């Protein structure tokens, strides 16, 4: 019994392991380049089903808690390993020993409370290392990164437990492109801990409090090019002269992101910035200013000159006391050297005229996503305002009149670039005034329905994309680039109006086709982007686009964005891949050929009808159809005549004087039906013939040369034959009045020829002695 239980347990373990391996394999997807994605797959361990060909392995957002020495041993070619957001709390010492080619390692947001330098010693090729969000207090007992000579991007720290930075922490690192330190709860900083890094292109420092900021700042001035301070409360910051050290600063850009500041602390920050001799760019993103704009300091000192700062960027600045804010007049003297200013999404509605006049060096001004209107813009662009301004961006404000904007900006003599996109204009006046040097105008997403002469003729670049335009017919002789995508144009613009055009982007309109002639008319065109239109894939269009090899160099979005909209059977297919049949591509020739063939067929039928009396046959067919529509033959009691006599008018003498006399004067007499005597006047002759034949017991045909030349005799013969065929009786009697050669009977008398071949006929004898026998035989034939 114990042996049986042991076997059951072993089998259970094996089955469980096999299921786990199968689950791991199902959670992974690998491509032919060796990139395997297994994120969010509920994996409990690193899969062992992969081969050494794997180069990139993404196992983020799983449930891996432990990495053993053998888990990654086979992945000798691995270059990127992403293990972020698992539950990893333990990594064995030699877990990464086989990863000598690894360049990217992400262990962020796990539960690693202790870091070991032995993990990283084998990683001689490592360039990226992310250790953010793990609950360690320090960066280990020994230097973690001293062996990582190729490391360029390093991210360390956490929001809660990382409290201490030591001098050994960054030993061995000489150059980093990016260093991010989350020191939100930092309590201890050993001087010169960051000074060991000789050069850092971009340092991101998270600090909730500013207590240790100056100590860290001293170590950074000579090694960091771009310093970014995040999530810091500077409301009580105070600059201390004793904290300054290096005067030869390398910092060129200082960014404050999600920082809280007051009027007084900003004054102190200005003091700090004045110590950075090479500072050129200052940026404030998502910051909060708890003040009213009085930056003179509590001791009434003068505002500190920020030095050589040329670029100032402010994005999404929150000012709780916005409606009590001052006019910034205290900062006016500091703005004369600034060349680039961006104030985006910060509720700016006015730049005071006096401030605009102080911005003498300003070349670039971006006031996007603010509250500017024409009236306040006129005050901002007053006389002598922004004398050096070349680029003005007023995207997504509250502007509504193109005419007023152009007139207002006439004071800006050097303005060349204007972006007023994402405002709402709707209407464009026929004429406008603009600065003489205007080269670039952006009117995209302004809801305009048409373009007029309001557009300045001096433009070299025009962007009117994402509007409601269905026609573009402006003459812009200097225009080099036209962006007109996402409109309702149905054809390319007239090339003669744009003789200098180099770039045309006209995607996502309603264009159905364009031709080689149209493209060739743009003599200077180098780039065309016309994808996303509703192309009609005609044979001409396909031939042009598929056979012109040079076209691919001009169409920058070819072939992916060029799809057929019609014909329906190729809708959604790439223009490059569509092939139409010969009948679709040569329809005109095909229709012409069919028409010619039809004409020849009709001509042939006409010749045949004439040759074989086709018209006569059709008449007979019509008569026969009319006869077939009539009721069936009347019963025997309706038979009125013994015989209907069919004869030619030229044989009337023989019929009326001989035949009628012999038969009707015989005892008992025969009753004959003759057309001259018995046809009902006013009745259609065809109906008379049909009725007479149907009311007669027999039909006597008096055959002669005259008979076969008579059309009506032919009708009578055919109807008699139809009767014979339909009623299966022997109603026809042939009387040969004169010898007739069968070959002499016309082909159209096929019935007569057939009857003469199948029936015995009576021949009228010229010998009088034999004529009595003829009449006896005829009477007998009629009675039969």
Swiss-Prot record:
Annotated GO CC locations: Golgi apparatus; membrane raft; phagocytic vesicle membrane; plasma membrane; receptor complex
> Can you state the subunit structure given in the record?
Interacts with LY96, TLR1 and TLR6 (via extracellular domain). TLR2 seems to exist in heterodimers with either TLR1 or TLR6 before stimulation by the ligand. The heterodimers form bigger oligomers in response to their corresponding ligands as well as further heterotypic associations with other receptors such as CD14 and/or CD36. Binds MYD88 (via TIR domain). Interacts with TICAM1. Interacts with CNPY3. Interacts with ATG16L1. Interacts with PPP1R11. Interacts with TICAM2. Interacts with TIRAP.
Q: What PROSITE patterns would the database entry show?
A: LRR, TIR
Q: How does it sit in the membrane?
A: Single-pass type I membrane protein
* LRR repeat residue numbers: 54-77, 78-101, 102-125, 126-150, 151-175, 176-199, 200-223, 224-250, 251-278, 279-308, 309-337, 338-361, 362-388, 389-414, 415-437, 438-457, 458-478, 479-500, 501-524
Q: Report the protein name in the record.
A: Toll-like receptor 2
Please report the stretch or stretches of sequence annotated as the TIR domain. 639-782
Q: Which keywords appear in this protein's UniProt record, sorted alphabetically?
A: Cytoplasmic vesicle, Disulfide bond, Glycoprotein, Immunity, Inflammatory response, Innate immunity, Isopeptide bond, Leucine-rich repeat, Membrane, NAD, Receptor, Repeat, Signal, Transmembrane, Transmembrane helix, Ubl conjugation
Keyword Disulfide bond assigned to the entry: answer is: yes
Occurrences of domain LRRCT (ranges): 525-579
Is Membrane there in the keyword field? yes
Q: Which sites does the entry annotate for glycosylation?
A: 114, 199, 414, 442
Query: Can you tell me where the transmembrane regions are?
Result: 588-608
Share the domain note from the entry.
Ester-bound lipid substrates are bound through a crevice formed between the LRR 11 and LRR 12. The ATG16L1-binding motif mediates interaction with ATG16L1.
Residue span of motif ATG16L1-binding motif: 761-778
Q: Where mainly found?
A: membrane
Residue intervals annotated with topology Extracellular: 21-587
Organism placement in taxonomy:
Eukaryota, Metazoa, Chordata, Craniata, Vertebrata
State the compartments where it is located: Membrane; Cytoplasmic vesicle, Phagosome membrane; Membrane raft
Q: Which residues lie on this side of the membrane: Cytoplasmic?
A: 609-784
Look up and give the organism this protein is from. Macaca mulatta
| Site (described: Interaction with bacterial lipopeptide) | 349
